[in-house]
A protein has these predicted regions:
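Conserved N-terminal beta-strand and adjoining loop/helix that marks the start
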Residues: 1-18, 36-39
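Conserved hydrophobic/aromatic beta-strand scaffold that supports enzyme active sites
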Residues: 10, 19, 83-87, 103-105
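A conserved beta-turn-beta hairpin within the catalytic core of GNAT-like acetyltransferases
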Residues: 26-31
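The catalytic Nudix box helix
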Residues: 35-68
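Active-site-adjacent beta-strand/loop module that shapes the phosphate/pyrophosphate-binding cleft
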Residues: 61, 71-94, 108
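NUDIX/MutT-family hydrolases
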Residues: 87, 95-128
Length: 131
């Protein structure tokens, strides 16, 4: 089966980044602590998908984003994913917990479940340092 496309949003506040704890009833990666993400619909532009997913999951309207990296990931249910990760640099609204079990600001990468999310944050931090 071909990998599906997903978009990942990285929202930073000071030295902290926004993470979510996925609900236990989710078929993909239940209960993990991860960056907010979602599937790209067929024919949908990646940036449009990110805007839609962040509105659905967090209730925010993304105004500006910067591409960080593309990752390959195999989810707990075996789904293969190409994850397009973006740092969200400007948005309207306050993040709300709409689809996850909870959302919170985290500053310790070790508290995140997925190594791929940890590496994505590191890549984003290196990009920031090189500019």
């Amino acid at each position: 089966m071909e990998p599906v496309n997903v978009v990942v949003g990285i929202i930073v506040q000071g030295k902290k980044f926004l993470v979510e704890r996925r609900r236990m009833d989710k078929k993909i990666d239940p209960g993990i602590i991860c960056l907010p993400a979602g599937h790209v619909n067929s024919g949908e532009d990646l940036e449009d998908a990110l805007k839609r997913e962040m509105l659905e999951e967090l209730g925010i309207q993304v105004k500006q984003m910067t591409f960080v990296c593309k990752n390959y990931y195999v989810a707990s249910n075996g789904e293969k994913q190409h994850a397009y990760c973006y740092k969200i640099t400007d948005y309207d609204g306050e993040p709300q917990c709409i689809e996850a079990a909870e959302i919170f600001w985290e500053d310790d990468l070790n508290n995140m479940t997925l190594d791929i999310d940890k590496e994505t944050i590191r890549k984003m931090q290196r990009l920031k340092e090189s500019h």
